[in-house]
C-alpha cells in the first residue's frame, strides 16, 4: 500500500490528473475511481474531492488537460501564425508527431479510448469544451 503523503503535497490536482490518465490507459476507464487515484498519489481518499466532485469531473479534467497541453504545444511550434503559409501545415504536422512521441500516454488516452475520442472529436462541442483549440480552427 502507498504511504500517505503529508498535507502539503505540491500540485496535487496535476498529479491526480496524470495518475488518472495512467490508470485509464493501463486498466480502462471502467477501472478508474477517485479512491484508486488517491492511492496512486499516496494521499488520503478524501483529498481528491478538494479538486473533483466525482469520477466524471476528474475524467473531464483529464481530457481538458491533455487538450490544453496539445494545443499549447502546437501553437508554440509555429512562428508564422499565417494559416495561408504552406509551411505552417508542415510545422504543425511535425509538432503533432513530436508531442505524442514525448507524451505517448496522452495519445493512448485520447485515441485508444472510445469515450474520450468521441468527446474530443465532436467539433460542435470544441468551442465550449476546449477553448484552447479555438485558435487552431481559425
Predicted regions and their residues:
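Hydrophobic alpha-helical connector segments
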Residues: 61, 76-106
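Amphipathic alpha-helical segments used for helix-helix packing
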Residues: 101-120
